[in-house]
């Protein structure tokens, strides 16, 4: 069976990310053109326009630039905080084995750029601007990766996004610890009380949570601002106390029941109940990222670029930047520090055996991504505004950020192109990208058998079901000479229950029931709803409580995703797909054909 896309369709999401990066770049160019046009004086005049709000005798006033940097950017940091919370709770950073390399690389990519910057600016006011070079702009990073378009970027993209999460944590910590004003204890104590109240909001009735979160978040922003801490960190603080979870079976099934009732008797009461039930089956963290994310990407960040990227690039500024250790410190920190820090740390971690890269991800690919990580736009410009008070020096730092971003993009492009030229990729999908691992893979037959047959399959695919008979005959023919390996390739576009079935098989595998569960799901392919899957798990002897916990664990989902990403790396789009002794089998998959292919793969065969 063929599917047009593997796993959850990422096209719309990636298109949105690329469009957001393009819009951010467009507004950056507009800001630079505006600041260098005959109307350049209107740029600063416009962003210094005061905006006030009065309530009785109370009066507050911000400039338009402060409104963007201090208020609207709180939403950006809110989204960053939500994504950090999700990654550490249910995402890539829940498993040490997959997190250690990008985490260590990110730490090196934070520290080495700062050290290099301080070599250029060891003292004086400019030395405090070391935070400008520590962060990577995730939006531009994703957009640059899409423009350069290295082949099969899935694993590299996951690595870089994981790295970016740790990068964001470091940048947020730097802002909180080193770039806040004089601390006012009373206001901060009020902020702590408000934060405790935010933690308790989850216990309120669902209908009251949204408004309560909003009111307390605004109050926290005001308290942090009064307390001397940069108020945008209110967004992070609120995000970190908002709960996140994977969809729970009970809530999903409850939503299905309400929808079924609405289908049988459509009315406004059932419609409201169905909407509420569907909403509550997804964590508020995910709903907020989905709801606010586009406004941040297509509204807040472009406005931030327009307000902060307007650097006057006249001859005097350019010559001053060329002679300025501040500018060179920013460029060297971002371009050299990120490339050497991330790549070097990755090499060291692999060398000493502390961690390993995902299958198909090489150090050369990491180097290209590390170079792109030198695009430190959004938070870099944000910290320029916090760390440097002198307008002339701030402009020189902004020139450094813009120059570093261009050089980092060019460096990443060159590394990807040169490594592909000197080390051309092998034919896609001809060989397995990941060797069989007896400690990880699902095997039948002796571990040390001389012949290996690997199948990428889908439990809802009728052809995979028919192939099980062929596999049984092949195994009977070779006996102990053959080991058979199953790997997942759920084609969700054509088999909507395939991913759930794959997860169920992995949850059963944790109780030693993988092939038992697979056999019964193949027998009843038309009945793979959750109530059926739980019945099958019970029939094969699984502990249902443990099965339910494992089914919704990140470990199980990542295990299926690993196989799916391997398949994407090899450009597999059909099931079943077989590999005979590591080489792709492109002929028929009846038992006779598979037996001939296995016999021909023996050493010394003609």
Task: For the regions a language model picked out, list residue spans one by one.
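Conserved redox-active cysteine motifs that mediate thiol-disulfide chemistry
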Residues: 459-469, 493-496
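Membrane-interfacial segments at transmembrane helix termini in multi-pass membrane proteins
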Residues: 243-266, 350-360, 401-440
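C-terminal ends of transmembrane helices
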Residues: 7-11, 78-95, 142-153, 196-207, ...
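Conserved helix-turn-beta segment immediately C-terminal to the redox Cys motif
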Residues: 468-489
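C-terminal cap of thioredoxin/glutaredoxin-like
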Residues: 454-457, 466-473, 534-606
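Entry/N-cap segments of selected transmembrane alpha helices
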Residues: 87-115, 184-196, 315-340, 363, ...
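Predominantly late transmembrane helices and immediately cytosolic-facing juxtamembrane segments
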Residues: 2-16, 32-36, 49, 194, ...
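Transmembrane alpha-helix boundary signature
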Residues: 34-46, 59-65, 79-95, 111-131
